[in-house]
Amino acid sequence: MTTIVDKARNDMAVFEEMESAVRSYSRGWPVVFEKAKGYKLWDKNGNEYIDFFAGAGALNYGHNPSEMQKVMIDYIQNDGVIHSLDMATAPRKKFLESFNEIILKPRNMDYKVMFPGPTGTNTVESALKIARKVTGRDTVIGFTNAFHGMTIGSLSVTGNSFKRNGAGIPLNHAISMPFDQYVDEQDSIAYIERFLEDSGSGVALPAAFILETVQGEGGINAARLEWVKKIEEICRKWDILLIIDDVQAGCGRTGTFFSFEEAGINPDIVCLSKSIGGVGLPMAITLIKPEFDQWGPGEHNGTFRGNNLAFLAATEALNNWKTDAFSQNIKKMSSLFQERMKRIVEKFPELNADLRGRGLMLGIGVHVDGLAGEICAEAFSRGLILETSGAKDEVVKFLPPLIIDEDGIEKGMDILEESIQAALEK
């Protein structure tokens, strides 16, 4: 039987011959994609795929939202400024005004908005730099299985050894502490506090903690809200800055705009990227409490921190948050997802599986070596795009666009069931 993958193999030759060996997603999904809309993609042969990947979280509002397309096309046709570094432009002005009125003010948040560059690692690097400058300390505490980006500072607070080793140099001035429930039900809070209290621990008072409330690349590990609150309490007790990395978990992914809202905490610095750009265009922002916004002009900069098309799409995306309807629908779709996940795990006890995540950032931990990857490969051959996550790629990760509907969930999960069955029969 000729599969989707077989038909596309010849189309992949140029990528295999000319592109660096570092390429990743094109290996697992070896087709040439040509069109995308909503929660679906199509390859050049017309094969349709349900997207449970959403650009690794950059497409929370789906592929090519019509309202975002329109504002960008109109702007280009009227010769709007595309590239502007940090010069003042109309799209930048409108984004700042809308973000303040729609996101910050209703949540009683007071932050300066920094545009550090176009990517998630840019916002993380800026957060680490300003935390060290403000406190005069150099150490930052990260957490086991964390992922914060691929540049040196971000790698230093990342847990994954494969990614860390790619730096090629020692990654200093960072310490890893156990994430919530890293060792069964043991209290990692007491462990962390003991390190800070004990002058013999070898741990210097850090400038900051950097935390993902839900670890995406690390395995869809969702910290309990009470644990997140205790981390903030530690920071306040010891005068340590709290950085929340919401690059993947933010912009509605967990059901609220910020992933930490339900914990009721007030971070000093917040990192946003991926879906902050609305339509998948590169954009990142760093939110900094005003008292910590101690940069000198140009002290942190970047050529592509003024993406006006992204500002336009981002502003349009914020309209989804004017009422709580969008948030409530995310929670409804999350419940449907989790119901199907539970039934699947019960149907296939051979997976030795556990369920993970919050909102529409979900996963099935598969505790059989290599099986999660085989399931994802089978799913792709049947028209469902999924990836794995976790230190050993042991988690089947669900990151659908937030605009997915019940039909998309049911069809996607039907494919997943077929894929699990096929993988188990190999």
UniProtKB/Swiss-Prot annotation:
Gene3D superfamilies per record: Aspartate Aminotransferase, domain 1, Type I PLP-dependent aspartate aminotransferase-like (Major domain)
InterPro entries assigned: Aminotrans_3, Aminotrans_3_PPA_site, Dat, Ectoine_EctB, PyrdxlP-dep_Trfase, PyrdxlP-dep_Trfase_major, PyrdxlP-dep_Trfase_small
Annotated keywords: Aminotransferase, Pyridoxal phosphate, Transferase
Cofactor(s) needed by this chain: pyridoxal 5'-phosphate
Tagged with keyword Transferase: yes
GO terms assigned for molecular function: diaminobutyrate-2-oxoglutarate transaminase activity; diaminobutyrate-pyruvate transaminase activity; pyridoxal phosphate binding
Pathway(s) the chain acts in: Amine and polyamine biosynthesis; ectoine biosynthesis; L-ectoine from L-aspartate 4-semialdehyde: step 1/3
CDD domains given in the database record: OAT_like
GO biological process: ectoine biosynthetic process
Entry EC number(s): 2.6.1.76
Keyword presence, Transferase: yes
Sites of N6-(pyridoxal phosphate)lysine modification: K274
Record-stated family: Belongs to the class-III pyridoxal-phosphate-dependent aminotransferase family.
Designated name of the protein: Diaminobutyrate--2-oxoglutarate transaminase
This protein's encoding gene: ectB
